Amino acid sequence: FSPRFAIPGLSRLDDRDVRLMLLHDQATDSESDQRVGDVRLMMPFTVEKPGFSVGPNIIRAWVNPYGPSGVPIIERREAHQIIDDVYSTIALGCVALPKVLVFPDVPSDGPAVSLLRSVAIGNGLPIAMTQTVKRPVLNAWQDSEMYFHEALSGHHRRNYNRLFRQLGERGDLQYQIARSPDDVRLAMEEFLLLENRGWKGEKRSSLASDRYRGAFAREAINNLAQQDKCRIHALTLDGDVIASLIVLVEANRAWTWKTAYDESLRQFSPGTLLMMRATETLLDDPNVVFADSCALPDHPVMTRLWTETRDMTTLVVGVDPQLETEVRKAASQIELYSQTRNLAKQMRDRLRTMVKRR
């Protein structure tokens, strides 16, 4: 929800009406009478029905395939009072918003979730947690050599070293990191071209295949680069980009946001080789203590390279003590919808496998 990342996507990534919840001070400038209060909380959200569109409406913190986290931005100072104010304000009858809040894809052990839960419990508000999955993460407390020695078997380490050596025999193989705004701008265009040449381009799911997604990605990444909050890692072969990885950084944390590789070289696993180099960089960077893969729980590459996981869950909060039934129903609808989607995906994948065999 970093403003430089989220705001470019509000009107470009979702057909729904995405609104912006802000809590700020009401201090005024005596000369201009303009409100100059600091923002204490920011959260994009949608108003919708949970799961299969059954039951009362909910306030859902906005998540999307390009922002898989529903944690609102909360000012650390007086954070408990801020959340208490949010709950009590939404509970007012004069506020024309649903009275059930849903925070999807939030770390169950994170400080924000602990805060949201503790304030709710302290006020006797009903809560539920559902749709818990494990996401690959990286705790950067080891050096890279020790980490890979423990994370990968000797067979896999030798295999990846062999692939890197064989790829280097085809030309001048280089690992590069774009960090300055100008370098990031150029590397971003190379990423978009590389991703669009692969299967995502064929299925029209690449960033560049949709002008709104492309505009969002360019603006968001270039905005972050202006504040030194973006790195684009790349493998190049004779000067041509064959794998690219966009990493977002904030304070001492990193997110491996998007990756693409040259599918004509898939036998060398350039995407995996790049992720290994990027992992080494993250582990050896004293300014990074934690990295989020932003990956699905069963991601074939990240679950192998990053052996640690973090529980990601959906937190449901009712802003009135009498809403326990509504909270329970919303949580069960969300869980049922998730299970049904996963089952449909498994069936679709099996059908595709059967068709390919024929």
Language-model features: locations:
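A conserved beta-strand-loop-helix scaffold within acyl/acetyltransferase catalytic domains
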Residues: 1-62, 105-267, 357
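Residue-level detector of flexible, active-site-proximal loop/helix-junction positions
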Residues: 134, 182, 298, 319-322
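Short intrinsically disordered coil segments
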Residues: 87-89, 150-156, 328-337
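Acyl-donor binding region in acyl/amide transferases
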Residues: 25-29, 49-131, 248-317
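Membrane-proximal basic amphipathic "stem/tether" segments
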Residues: 319-358
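Short beta-strand-to-coil "C-cap" segments at the C-terminal boundary of structured domains/repeats
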Residues: 139-140, 317-321
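Short helix-loop capping/hinge motifs at secondary-structure junctions, enriched
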Residues: 79-81, 143-145, 322-324
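Short conserved micro-motifs at the rims of enzyme active sites and ligand-binding pockets
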Residues: 147-148, 303-305, 326-329
